[in-house]
């Protein structure tokens, strides 16, 4: 088995790590950074930029720069109306699904496709670092991700050409990294507030056993929401002063979003920051500039309700684990948003103790994923990981009632069955509607899929016995079987319908991703060829100047002609001609260098016995034993 990497596919940033010599190592990307922005851009030239390169050009290309895509993955359009308003690019409806529109590509992309490009970069950078092709990974997801979002994340991996060996919950991964070397038993609470999601998990950790006792969270709460409060505040204040709503201009919105994130980060270290955006828009009286100050106190008041929203999941997790805050030994902070002082103070107030900040909140999840990858590949032994399903799973029964089959916080993998019957006399088929959530009515929960079991022998209502079995694998992904006990007929469904993509969609996207990779490779090769050809032309010109009159006029004319033809081919971007002329010019320059070297060889050769120093002279000049030889005494001075 080759190397398996661990990937934290984040809302804002992503990280890849690997085990080396039994120790987890975070892999720097091609730009030298240990975190890669989860940003993808499509340029006018149809180049695909990923990471820092994409982020840098976002202000100039807001409609084709995709960020915070994790907030849309595996979701239906009706579930993301608030999030869609927070981004500068267009989020469009495709039936009930979500697509992201690129004007430069004139195409709608599924969130999975965009995430796949981020995953592909992470794996490519890891392959270069390790010196071997990486094809397998463990990918993390928020603990509170539902079945659709987990399935969609797995689809993103497949589109990127990665075999996803395991989907692992982010707080669980963080606990793995935190507790790997700990022998004493501890009860820890992992508080994970990232760019787009919030999770809290309680685990018992010690001596290689990691048992999740409960998990809770909010997949609509993260650093992006804090940024948005600053954006709205700045936009509202600017509108009062200038009468212009900057949120209606995509470029201005992108600049505001970047400035808001920067201000939020700065306010973790200082109590006041200045936000200065010159030429943010223009009116009839000329350019307008935004120049405002923001204090930490104002920021905290803007986000007060968001901060309060983290309390309920923490309390829920404690209740589900049947623990009080006094039972918690350590609170581990994960995610960049936990650097906000108000968040740290809130955690301290809720739990009653200072949070443990010994781990890097940006990297700890990827490190834990790498450890889990090591467990699966056999590199790490004596580690037992017992995770849970975050939300209850069940079926819709008569009257639209939600009937749970697997309650939330059940340890996975697991398999549970319930027996149901028909609702009408002579009924020969039943529809199984699979749902996920905590509400009492089925319609208020997440619908994961429907399927029919036909061929039930006619009988009075309530007589047939239909056994419904739920099976959750270690990834937290569900399959359901319905079986009529009398006839033995059964129907199984893997809840892939929960994903927003069909198998055909995924297969098509895999093929497109492979062709894009081929196109990108060709484009890179063309750029390299242009740079090499341009450099060669410059070097050839310089050599002609340096050699001057030593170059025959015929050789000079030939090389100058090749340089001229090569530059014309470069301007036409005729790459076949460029390659041919580059080879011809290389040969001509080589031939000229060889010719000039041979011409200079006789005059530069060492003198023979009849010229210069006589044989056996030891390299001393002068004549042997002649009158011109002067003997001198040598005295050493001490």
Curated annotation (Swiss-Prot):
Residues 628-638 have a biased composition (Acidic residues). Belongs to the heat shock protein 70 family. Acts as a chaperone. This is Chaperone protein DnaK. CDD domains: ASKHA_NBD_HSP70_DnaK-like. Induction: By stress conditions e.g. heat shock. The modification Phosphothreonine is found at residue 197. Keywords: ATP-binding, Chaperone, Nucleotide-binding, Phosphoprotein, Stress response. GO terms for molecular function: ATP binding; ATP hydrolysis activity; ATP-dependent protein folding chaperone; heat shock protein binding; protein folding chaperone; unfolded protein binding. Residues 615-624 have a biased composition (Gly residues). GO terms for biological process: chaperone cofactor-dependent protein refolding; protein refolding. The keyword Ribosomal protein does not apply. Residues 598-638 are annotated as: Disordered. InterPro entries: ATPase_NBD, Chaperone_DnaK, Heat_shock_70_CS, HSP70_C_sf, HSP70_peptide-bd_sf, Hsp_70_fam. Pfam families: HSP70.
